């Protein structure tokens, strides 16, 4: 039996659906009455750990889960030792720099040196601003980073954007995209090397299923 780390929140429904498509039923985690954090699949071949999105790579990197599904943004932020196996094509969004729409800034390079930038993704932000050779003061926030520019605490934010509605509703505008993100199937490198077949079988099935889904979406 192998273990899969599933992220609570926005990716959970489609993650469960993806595993269901390849024969692993973890639908019990979607039951509102469920309080178990470790749930076996109906077939008994695997079990799922229900964890926070940011904890998925941690469980996988330590080998407590052999597979997991997590956003690419989390992988970029944490840089843990996990294998990025398959782009699953859902949970799509992008990481962007945003400012107040009234600021007049048109790109990240327009920001003044040593200005404050608020973000939940400070490692991603640091890497980006280092690349464009702009020194900034990073302010780590755990949520509602839009309040940084609104309150005047920060000149800009670095955050995930899906539809952009939250930014618009709060008078903010994107000025630069760092990278695109989507859900990824990740694996524990050593477990993959020692695998006698079961893990690779699931990985191959998920890769085929994700490609089928992408083709199907493209025809709609």
Curated annotation (Swiss-Prot):
PROSITE patterns: ATP_P_PHORIBOSYLTR. It catalyses: 1-(5-phospho-beta-D-ribosyl)-ATP + diphosphate = 5-phospho-alpha-D-ribose 1-diphosphate + ATP. GO terms for cellular component: cytoplasm. GO terms for molecular function: ATP binding; ATP phosphoribosyltransferase activity. It comes from the Bacteria. Disulfide bonds: none annotated. GO terms for biological process: L-histidine biosynthetic process. It holds the Pfam family HisG. Pathway: Amino-acid biosynthesis; L-histidine biosynthesis; L-histidine from 5-phospho-alpha-D-ribose 1-diphosphate: step 1/9. Keywords: Amino-acid biosynthesis, ATP-binding, Cytoplasm, Glycosyltransferase, Histidine biosynthesis, Nucleotide-binding, Transferase. NCBIfam families: hisG. Heteromultimer composed of HisG and HisZ subunits. Catalyzes the condensation of ATP and 5-phosphoribose 1-diphosphate to form N'-(5'-phosphoribosyl)-ATP (PR-ATP). Has a crucial role in the pathway because the rate of histidine biosynthesis seems to be controlled primarily by regulation of HisG enzymatic activity. This is ATP phosphoribosyltransferase.
